[in-house]
């Protein structure tokens, strides 16, 4: 959507849904899409509320519903997504 930013070496799985309006057609609200930092991986069928930042190297698991920022090099999993430590073996840059 408008006002979204995706940096380099990002993987976005199929059917990921990004929003840019937290209150659709209800109030005047500044549109703010997600910011996806370099090297992040977004799983299939994920949903992001507006104005969310996914940090560098973070992974969002398939089917997650992201309602808050995901710190760099962490794992977001579940609905709503909970933030977990990224396993050490996954703390490597994407090879896209």
Label every model-predicted segment.
Residues 1-77, 82-83:
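Structural signal for interior beta-strand "rungs" in well-ordered beta-sheet cores
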Residues 87-95:
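A glycine/serine/threonine-rich, flexible loop-to-helix segment
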């Amino acid at each position: 959507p408008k006002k979204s930013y995706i940096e380099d070496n990002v993987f976005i799985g199929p059917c990921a849904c990004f929003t840019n309006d937290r209150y659709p057609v209800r109030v005047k609200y500044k549109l703010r899409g997600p910011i996806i930092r370099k090297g992040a991986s977004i799983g299939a069928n994920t949903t992001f509320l507006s104005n969310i930042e996914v940090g560098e190297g973070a992974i969002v698991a398939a089917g997650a519903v992201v309602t808050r920022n995901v710190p760099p090099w962490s794992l977001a999993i579940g609905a709503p997504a909970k933030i977990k430590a990224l396993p050490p073996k996954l703390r490597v840059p994407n090879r896209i």
